[in-house]
């Protein structure tokens, strides 16, 4: 799928998701300089389920923790595809990538292995109640009736605002990017994160 198509789907989904902003309260994400909350979560990489530990990942180097609304939706698909495309550069910088959404682990097993999206190159974790997101100051937005993913399936879970945290090996947040407040496209989260980890 071309990037033009990804952007078109993202725009349609964005309109659907944010057409009733009065029903959502904006999140106030943790700021640069804050200590990143540790967590362990069910995750999948290349279709294989495992327990992801942020603390363990940080022993290897910086971590790019990105929250996204839903697998198999335009903007999130573009973001995952871009992370997969640039994965070798993140690895060269010593960085780990972990995506987190409210999708259940079954959806993430498929999403993580799909060659159009994560392509098995990095893990995505399940936060169905938004508990991990809450520790980072992000509020889980309620499910929206009628929202379907790119496969035509109903999206029944809530949505975590698209927000990326770059965390250094000392557990400090060194960068935060939010589509809500910074108004940046999904693939820009990836490019900005890569620029940061290359400088650490």
State where each predicted segment sits.
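Chalcogenol-based redox active-site neighborhoods
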Residues: 24-200
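Bacterial N-terminal signal peptides
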Residues: 9-21
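Bacterial N-terminal signal peptides that target proteins for export
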Residues: 1-11
